[in-house]
Amino acid sequence: MCRPLSVVAVLGALAVTAPAAWAAAWSTVASPNPSGGQDVLNEVGRLRGTNVLYAVGRTNLGTLVLRSANRGASWQVESAPSPGTGTQLFGVSVRVGGVWAVGYLSGPSRTSTVTLRRKGGTWTRVPSPNPDFADQLYGVVTTPAGTWAVGTGTGTGGNSHPLILHWTGRAWKTQPAPALPKGNNQLFGIAGKGSDLWAFGQREKNGGTLHPLALHHTASGWHVSKTPDPARGGESFFFGGTISGGTVWAVGGRGSGSRHALAERHTASGWKAVTVPDGAGCTATNELTAVVPIPGTKHLLAVGDCSPGPGNRTLVERRRNGAWHQVSSPTPDATGSFLTGVVAFSQTRAAAVGYRTPAGFRTLALIYH
């Protein structure tokens, strides 16, 4: 799942929390910074049943793709096409049949979608539609039902709407999205299990306020799934989500000014906001950017960032025994450390990626072991 760099918040040191149930802890590992000044990781995905991970982002030269063969303990740069220096990758989907990465290229006259595919060890760019004046992709998912990518399209009038693409096996095709009132309507992430597909983002209504947006794909197409707005008129949004068993989860942020972490779940009775703690000492901002199930358990793992004021800290939350708890995680740079993607292997092994801001941008990689 994924989010634009401009909407991720900013800060400074440590994190706290809930008593450890297993003898494992988060630690920082080395990660490449090819450009040495503008390197960011936005998402990470795992090849199921293996120790192989792929992380995507950008450098000051364009796309950035990293690969790990040992569950995130070490990372190597993979050569990947970059249409231009303004190219960023935000979403990645990893399957045995190939790896997809999506994002966009900011050019001098317009912004256009970018889709890359890794097959047979080689990355290639695949043509993708650009129906609007500015089009951006933030999330991608592959299931037995196919591959889907989501983002936002913006017309010349400045209003944005959800952008949904489907890979037919030969080409990307635009899919109809539900009609929404004009405004800032965007999708940042997508999750799927079999033919059950969900997309997550934000919608604008009531004079400019932002509210969580969830779309559900059924046999008749994509539909809005009504979600509660815990901010009650303040700014709220989803960055990403996941499907665990028969439950759909979405995470993001809520509230304007002093923003809080947001988690909601969907069951047969609909969407419901769930209590999730803010980071210890973080009274300025709290955002969760990604969430995944922990294999072999009913637990969930979510990552993001939080801030007590100046600078941002990494934020890790774990749901077990029916409640969310913060998990201690390192913040290598007090000026700003952000987590944007996470994968879980087991109760005692996980990996997360993001970026830090010591001077410019540097990639950030953590492992839980």
Language-model-detected regions and their locations in the chain:
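Secretory targeting and sorting signals
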Residues: 1-24
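Residue-level hotspots at or immediately adjacent to binding/recognition sites across diverse folds
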Residues: 22-369
